[in-house]
Structure formats: C-alpha cells, structure tokens
Amino acid sequence: MLKNFCITMLVFCLANVSAQNNLSFLNDSYSGINSAVISPTQPFLNPNPWDANLLSADVFLNNDYAYISSQSILGLSNATIVTANPNKNISGENQSNVLDFYNKDKANLLFGSDILGPSFSMSARIKERKYVFGIYSRFRTHASVLDMDNYFRFNNERVSEPNDYTFKPVSGTVMNWGEIGLNFAKSIFPESEKQWILGVNVKYEIGLDAANIIGKNLNLTSSEPTVTQNTTLRNIYATDYDLSASYITNYNFQTKRYEYKQNGSGIGLDLGIAVIDKDKREEKYNYKFAFSIVDLGYVNFKKGINHVFKDGNTIWLQNNPVFENRKFDSPEEFFQTLSSEAYDDANASLQDSGFKIGLPTSINMNYSQRIKKNHYINFNWIQRVPVFENSVKRNNWVNANYLIQKEAIGFGVSASLSEYKDLNFGGYFRIGPLILGSENAFPLLFNHKHLHAASFYMAIKLYPFWDNEMKRHRRQKCDCEK
C-alpha cells in the first residue's frame, strides 16, 4: 500500500511535466505561426505573406528519479524493459534495459507535450503599415514535481526505512487542455530609428483533465513486522498529515476508454514586444531583442473532485491487509478506502467540488544577431514565474543556437541548460514543408548509461518556400516618382 500511496502522489505530481518548445526552429524567421506560442511578435518577422501549420508535435521529458540503463530512445522500440529488483540482483548498474531508480534525496521530474493543430497567419498592409493576424489550435499537457523527498531510496538501497521520517512540503500539478488562440502583431513607434513590434495572443482554454496534490505535512513511522506479517517489509504508518488532492478526468475506468468532453474553461493571454535593427530596404534584420510573458491565466474546473486528509487516525500503509495486493479500479475508490482508514467514513475526506489550475506562466527573452547573410546566432532565456495558485510549472531553459535560414531550407545547432544544470545538445532541419528537430538529440540516437531525458519536435507546414526576396520586391508597387 505504501507504494500505491506514494505512486499516487507521484502520478498526481509528476503529471506536471512541461513541454519544451524547439527554440532553434522558433528562432527561424520562417517559423511563422508556430513561433507565436512562445513569442507573439515573431510571426511579424516572417518574410512570407502567409503561413499555415498542418500539424506539429513537441515532446519533452527530464527527470532524476528513474532511468533505463544502457539504451536510446530509438532502441526502446525493440527492447524488453524489466524493473530493477535488488532481491534478484537485477540492477541498471549491472545490465542493460532495466528500469532503475536514482538513490538521491530528492526527486524531480518535468514532462510535457505540445501539439499544434491547424493554424494560419497572414500579413496585411493597412495605411502603409504592416499587420499580422493569426489563429491557432493547440493541445497541451504539462506535469511536474520538484524537490520531492525520495522515500523509495531506502528500499532501492536495500536498507530499512527510518523509524521516523517527515516529508518536506511538496506540491504538484498536471493538466491536459486544448487552446484556441488569436495572434496579432503590429509595428509601433513609427518615428523611432529602430523598428518596434507589439504582439498579443488571446486564448480560450478548454480544460480536459487535471490533478493537483498539496502535501503540507506528512510524517511516516516504521516498525518491525510481527511473525504473522510479511517479514520482508516493515510496517509503515502515516501520522500528523495534512494532504489535499483534487482531480478530474475524462478516462472512464469502467469501460477503460477515454471519453472526450470539456471539463473546464478559462482565458489566457500572451504579451510580447520586440525591437529590431534593419535596413528598411531589406527583409532581414541586423539584430533583434524580444521580450514576452506568456500563459497568463487559469482554467476553472467547476466539477472537479476534492479530497482533504488532515488530523485523522493513524493510517497503516504497509503490511495493512486492507491494502496489500489490492487493485484499485479508480482514483475515487483509492481515496474512499484511504478516507475509511483516516476517518472511519469513506466520504469524510470529500470536500466541495471545483478547483482552478493556473497556466504555466513564464517570461521569455531572446537576442538574435546576424553574423553574415542568412547566418544568425540566438540566445534564449525562459524562466517560470507562477502567478496563480496551483499553477502548472514549465522548466527553466537557457539556450544558444546558430542558424542558417533560407526560403526553402534552414538548419541549426543548439546547446541548452535545462533547469540551469542539465546540458543538452540538439538542433533542427527544415526543408520545404517538413521540419524535424530536438533540443536534446543525443538520447534519441545513442545509448546512454542512464537514459532519463529526451526531446523531439516535428512539424508539417505550408508556406511559399518557393518564393524569395527578389521575387517579392518585383511584385511590390514602385514608388519611383517620389
């Protein structure tokens, strides 16, 4: 039961893994509407008059809790993975294809996916000024847990759990949601020597699934089992606890099917400003500095289920016959059983329905410098700044990349720091309508002793990649008499 209890906390917390956008491609001037999600001003820099995204997907994972030994992401398709078992001498340190666990004091996990559906942007000149309008559809998953006490490390190290252990406060959030966004960008300050750009995204949020767990206090005590109990496991009890869990899901646990419906709604806002230095006769800039704050807002799940466990009975977690070898058919059955142990009432922990989840607010800065024709070096900094209570959190990210970008082809290489400590290398390749990339490419292709992170990006777009700057100049109206 202890493992069920902790795994439930992890699932509810770890589900907040933040999707990491492919910054190398999004720095490409031809990224168009795809770049609006991280910088509302970037579509303004697209030389093409229109741009359409058919489908793009970005998946990001990073954790220091578990790993697969001596494997790559591509190699997983043909691998048989077994879980570490110290009693059988199965360990990731002595064989490959083992799901094993780090024995660190703290556990961290960041995961996310970001799918951009049919989206479109176009530019227009109104009273001799350029405006860009766009609309996009998006499906997002964010989940994370940061600095959670790793109680499992005692079992992993084959040592007895301490007689008394107090968890430090922890919280975690996970959310699946859809998004319909409107992008608008225009130039401002026309008298300035530099070109200033203002960009805005207004978003309608469609809540699908969410979970949030807050652990303000939890104390675990352990003692030796009696001769009639499982002598390989110590008895573990929860005391002095103050825990709350909220969730809502479209997964039907009876039919074991996902049944799509909207469970929440909200409004989101992205704001951005950029300044560029360029010759008015050229499309390409000399340098650019952009700042944006994205994902201001929250999703309200009015019918969400809330459970609170505080100041109840001592809960026997491990070796308790009520829990051992029992399979729970749904989260609600698990919480009702836990409530019976805590309060002698299956419904005592149930509270008023409804909760809110904040969007993964972050500030983003970008500096781009042209080195020579079609060659650019870019620096990006993304810092999470949660605004609302119970917000999902994205990962902090520092990225530098070198790009070569032309109308029909573009490519680049990058180096990144995730959470300011994990160094990753990657890049992207764009040819016509196809874009492939990764900000952490090595785990995709090469075996890692401890495979614990990965990143992949793919997009299919329609845009006039057959066009070029000379053709566009020829089509412009000549102002020869002035």
Question: Language-model segments: what does each one mean?
Answer:
Residues Q20-K482:
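Subset of outer-membrane beta-barrel
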Residues A15-A19:
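Sec/Tat signal peptide C-region and signal peptidase I cleavage site
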Residues N4-L14:
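Sec-dependent N-terminal signal peptides
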